UniProtKB/Swiss-Prot annotation:
This is Peptide chain release factor 3. It holds the Pfam family GTP_EFTU. The lineage of its organism: Bacteria, Pseudomonadati, Pseudomonadota, Gammaproteobacteria, Enterobacterales. GO terms for molecular function: GTP binding; GTPase activity; guanosine tetraphosphate binding; translation release factor activity, codon nonspecific; translation release factor activity, codon specific. GTP binds at residues 20-27, 88-92, 142-145. The keyword Cell wall biogenesis/degradation does not apply. GO terms for cellular component: cytosol. PANTHER family: PEPTIDE CHAIN RELEASE FACTOR RF3. It comes from Yersinia enterocolitica serotype O:8 / biotype 1B (strain NCTC 13174 / 8081). Increases the formation of ribosomal termination complexes and stimulates activities of RF-1 and RF-2. It binds guanine nucleotides and has strong preference for UGA stop codons. It may interact directly with the ribosome. The stimulation of RF-1 and RF-2 is significantly reduced by GTP and GDP, but not by GMP.
Length: 529
């Protein structure tokens, strides 16, 4: 392949994730994005809890029951001359750690906001994570077919609370039962709303020009007059779109629509392929890697078990940072210093797998993993370096785990270590007893772990409360002082799933006192993989 052909392939890639508060419509919009990208023929109406139609992107058993995205799926589809990689992130508020890590693998994010509710808690947290890397953000104001808040008010709230300038690209005409469509500020066109449920994409009627009398006929004179006045205010008060400000994460283009009614999603996708960046450079511990480089590099940001119920396998999700992947390629796993031949990499369509012949910078590929790959692993064509910025977050909730059948201790430990390697939960083994303590960022993770232990490892476990309120990874350059610290605090020390030493504190007061007592010891809230 010539350098110009390779450059063309990379330039076509757009890799993004959707962030939102639970129930803002993220899973529905994921479905409709795939529908407009022709990736699925039927957008299964999401979350008819208990219905036989399940969203294509929610496919683990527990997700099917609850109607929430617990795992991170990857979907690739063509749109507008580009190849789009969509990383679906857990929408439920308990799954932040997995979601955080997924955000390290994308070049752009789509923020979905329920226009009736505005900025919600989960959105704030996820925006903080995107801020760590100044990720560009597009915004979709959803649920226009319901009664919503004043759109100007919601934009002000986004600007104030999320510290990002808003630039409306489309603007709604009416809402709820009076929702008539949206006007595109830069194309001077009105798209009239016709609801399209499920997998039908309606032919949209377009009225050209803001002062076209056809608009008055289509939406009614009163509404048309009111809309034109509103638009004057909007154009005077809002920011013009600035591509550089978007790329630096300082400004977000805003689109309006209703994902459930299949309306407005294509306008947002048009903006995404036109403005979102092609694969971006990434930092390693030795240098910056740019997508145009000829040699293959990539990093693992997620490991998922049980993607195929018939085979108890695990798949490592790898983001290609540079170069071209080809079937049968020999790659170096930097952490283990081993060369491996990758003959059966996968590409995904949420649970449907197909074997992959090639992939380029920006793509996500799946590697079969029999316990040898960990989150944060870097793969190269020989160069020794490690991609940085793929963190573990200190858990906030803890439980002691006990077996119903004491003879299954070995299976329990194996299951917990594997689940911790894929980031589903963190495991701590205290140095002074045989307890197993699991730590999570949200309550639902405990449920996921117990149901997976049962279905994948045939282990029935129960949780008990434990006197731990927080954990920190500890390290120290002074060997003598570290030994003294370990000797005097042994009762509060534990090893995590990767055998890293951790301090498990019964209270925040205890942690603060210990930190003051041992200033030379570093207590870390996050740990690089």
């Amino acid at each position: 392949m010539s350098p110009s052909e390779y450059a063309l392939e990379v330039a076509k890639r757009r890799t993004f994730a959707i962030i939102s508060h639970p129930d803002a419509g993220k899973t529905t919009i994921t479905e409709k994005v795939l529908l407009f990208g022709n990736a699925i023929q039927t957008a299964g109406t999401v979350k008819g809890r208990g219905s036989s139609h399940h969203a294509k992107s929610d496919w683990m058993e527990m997700e099917k029951q609850r109607g929430i995205s617990i795992t991170t799926s990857v979907m690739q589809f063509p749109y507008g001359g580009c190849l789009v990689n969509l990383l679906d992130t857990p929408g439920h508020e308990d799954f932040s750690e997995d979601t955080y890590r997924t955000l390290t693998a994308v070049d752009c994010c789509l923020m979905v906001i329920d226009a009736a509710k505005g900025v919600e808690d989960r959105t704030r947290k996820l925006m903080e994570v995107t801020r760590l890397r100044d990720t560009p953000i597009l915004t979709f104001m959803n649920k226009l077919d319901r009664d919503i808040r004043d759109p100007m008010e919601v934009l002000d709230e986004v600007e104030r609370e999320l510290k990002i300038a808003c630039s409306p690209i489309t603007w709604p005409i009416g809402c709820g039962k009076l929702f008539k469509g949206v006007y595109h500020l830069y194309k001077d066109e009105t798209y009239l709303y016709q609801t399209g449920k499920g997998h039908t994409i309606q032919e949209v009627r377009i009225v050209k020009g803001l002062n076209n009398p056809d608009l008055d006929v289509a939406v009614g004179e009163d509404l048309a007059k009111q809309f034109r006045q509103e638009l004057e205010l909007v154009q005077g008060a809002s920011h013009e779109f600035d591509h550089d400000a978007f790329l630096s994460g300082d400004l977000t283009p805003v689109f309006f629509g209703t994902a459930l009614g299949n309306f407005g999603v294509d306008h947002m996708l048009d903006g995404l392929v036109e403005w979102a960046p092609a694969p971006m450079p990434r930092q390693t511990d030795t240098r910056e890697v740019v997508a145009a480089e000829e040699k293959f590099t990539g990093f693992v940001f997620k490991i998922q078990a049980n993607m195929d119920p018939k085979h108890r396998d695990r798949v490592a999700f790898l983001r290609v940072v540079s170069g071209r992947f080809e079937k049968g390629m020999k790659l170096r796993q930097v952490r283990t210093k081993k060369d491996v031949v990758i003959s059966d990499a996968l590409t995904f369509m949420a649970g449907d797998r197909s074997h992959l012949e090639e992939a380029y910078a920006g793509d996500i590929i799946g590697l079969h993993n029999h316990g040898t790959i960990q989150i944060g692993d870097t793969f190269t064509q020989g160069e020794d370096m490690k991609f940085t910025g793929i963190p573990n977050f200190a858990p906030e909730l803890f439980r002691r785990i006990r077996l119903r059948d004491p003879l299954k201790q070995k299976q329990l430990l194996k299951g917990l270590v594997q689940l911790s390697e894929e980031g589903a939960v963190q495991v701590f083994r205290p140095l002074t007893n045989n307890d197993l303590i699991v730590g999570a960022v949200g309550v639902l993770q405990f449920e996921v772990v117990s149901s997976r232990l049962k279905s994948e490892y045939n282990v029935e476990a129960v949780y008990e409360s434990v006197n731990v309120s927080t954990a920190r990874w500890v390290e120290c350059d002074d060997v003598k002082k570290f030994e003294e610290f370990k000797r005097k605090n042994e009762v509060n020390l534990a090893l995590d799933g990767g055998d890293n030493l951790s301090y498990i504190a019964p209270t925040m007061v205890n942690l603060n006192i210990t930190q003051e007592r041992y200033p030379e010891v570093r207590f870390r809230k996050t740990r690089e993989h």
